[in-house]
UniProtKB/Swiss-Prot annotation:
Thylakoid listed as a keyword: no
Species of provenance: Pasteurella multocida (strain Pm70)
Matches recorded under HAMAP family: MsrQ
Protein name (Swiss-Prot/TrEMBL): Protein-methionine-sulfoxide reductase heme-binding subunit MsrQ
Membrane-spanning residues: 7-27, 43-63, 77-97, 112-132, 142-162, 172-192
Length: 206
């Protein structure tokens, strides 16, 4: 069953980039709107944020259903999200800026939503690199701390999305609200866990 779920995840996550490749290869850029370059960037970024959001939602669902063995599926989703983020950044650098790195730095400094997006990208990159079993073992407890930053990367990604579209849309606000709820739930869970440990420690001393 776990193998079947993995296949479903990979097929679904491959869908967006496969569709985009088909559109570009077919030459039918009319499906990308009036500004294909902007649409490609937004499509890739939206796909990354969607997959990341699904990853955290499924994590909560698996926890509530008491199916911890399914949590390993989140790793594949996380790596796919990072893959789309890399494509999103590359599309911006290549298609929008023409590989002009000095302009990239200038844009990064002058545009707040790019700074927020860059921080989220950095967090996701570190998480992706640390998904290697060897590094996970070497990092010990720091691996857990690093991956807790994923919740903040999700929120930063949602803020980046809302800010970059410039106009308030239903999808951008929905993603922002869901991201805030997921982060708050994670922080509440950590608070309860630490409170429980503190209570146990005091009880042991008594």
């Amino acid at each position: 069953m776990l193998s079947l779920f993995r296949i479903i995840i990979h097929v679904c996550c491959l869908g967006p980039v496969a569709w985009l490749a088909w559109v570009l290869l077919s030459g039918d850029e009319s499906q990308l709107g009036a500004d294909p370059i902007k649409e490609i960037q937004h499509f890739l970024g939206f796909s990354a944020l969607t997959i990341l959001l699904i990853m955290f939602i499924l994590g909560k669902v698996f926890y509530l259903l008491k199916q911890p063995q399914l949590q390993v599926l989140r790793r594949a989703l996380g790596l796919w999200a990072w893959f789309y983020v890399v494509l999103h950044v590359y599309a911006y650098l290549a298609l929008e800026l023409g590989y002009d790195f000095s302009l990239f730095v200038q844009e990064l400094v002058n545009r707040g939503y790019l700074i927020i997006g860059a921080i989220a990208f950095l967090i996701l990159t570190l998480m992706a690199l640390s998904s290697w079993s060897y590094l996970k073992l070497k990092m010990g407890k720091w691996w857990f701390y690093l991956h807790q930053l994923g919740y903040y990367a999700l929120l930063l990604g949602a803020i980046h999305y809302v800010w970059s579209v410039k106009n308030v849309t239903f999808s951008s606000m929905l993603y922002l609200i869901l991201s805030i709820m997921i982060l708050c739930d994670a922080l509440y869970g950590l608070f309860i866990k630490r409170k429980g440990r503190s209570t146990s420690a005091h009880t042991g001393k008594d």
